Amino acid sequence: MDFSLNESQLSYLDTVRKFVKNEITPRILDMEKEHVFPWEIINKAWKTGLINLSIPESVRGYEMDLFTSALVVEGLSYGDTGISTSAMCNDLANVVIGLHGTDEQKNLFLKPFVEKPILASFCLTEPNAGSDNSMMAAFISKREDGKYILNGAKCFITNASYASQFTVLCKTGKPTGNFMACVIVPVEHVTSYDIPDIGNATREISVPAGGKIIIGKPEDKLGQRLSNTASVTFEDVVVFPNHIIGDRRLGFKYIIDVLDYARPMVAAIGLGLAKRAFDLTREYT
């Protein structure tokens, strides 16, 4: 098996290494001390092509293969795993749309990420269920007009305080239902110019379609401090039928595909961190 890198992959590696050296490494300690969300770095990563790697070419995305994506994530993680986690979670939230969404949904939900540096959140984990999907309580119920209502709480959600779109796994019909749906909840777009630093504040979002989302106080974490993590509560959020990905009974299958994408990325984050730790340790030998 040939593990050599092609010219495109070598070019991406060179780009991400220069980005880490010039934009991340000189600033992370001060940013962590000041509890500042790295909007400026996220913006520059977007302009450099180091974020939103999985978005299809049909909507002017990179449609980067899994191995090359892992190389980019590993490279960013060498600089800071919080920043790489925030960047990677955009793909975590959006890859299901690329895999199972219609052309209309790809244009509706993915194209905005190509056009501006916004963030997405992938909402799976719950306070009373962890990541055990069978114990999940968030659910959608169908109204007489054909629209759906989403209610439920999620926790430990990356990018939550700054997200412009939420990908949500929930039960169908009732909290104890046997089927799961994967729904997309877009909200008003948030950029660095809208919320430069949310600090320890909560955030309440009025959903354009109806209902509201309450974002809890950001978690004060031991590590990955430049990655925002918070709880998300959906209260009577209106979901249009075309905001449900694929079959509303097959959400679990779709999310498994997302997790299959995520696992190599998490491994790449660990590898980038290990390489950085090794290099820093060598300085003291």
Language-model regions, residue ranges each:
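A structural signal for short hydrophobic beta-strand segments in well-ordered beta-sheet cores
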Residues: 138-141
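Amphipathic, small/basic residue-rich leader segments at the start of a protein or domain
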Residues: 1-87, 104-108, 112-115
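Glycine-rich phosphate/pyrophosphate-binding beta-alpha loops
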Residues: 78, 129, 155-160, 261-265
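Glycine-rich beta->alpha junctions and the first turn(s) of the following alpha-helix
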Residues: 4-5, 78, 202-204, 210-285
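Short Gly/Pro-enriched turn/cap motifs at secondary-structure boundaries
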Residues: 128-131, 156-159, 172-174, 221-228
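A short core secondary-structure module
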Residues: 147, 151-213
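N-terminal glycine-rich flavin-associated loop
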Residues: 82-104, 130, 144
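A short, Trp-centered hydrophobic/proline-enriched beta-strand micro-motif
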Residues: 116-124
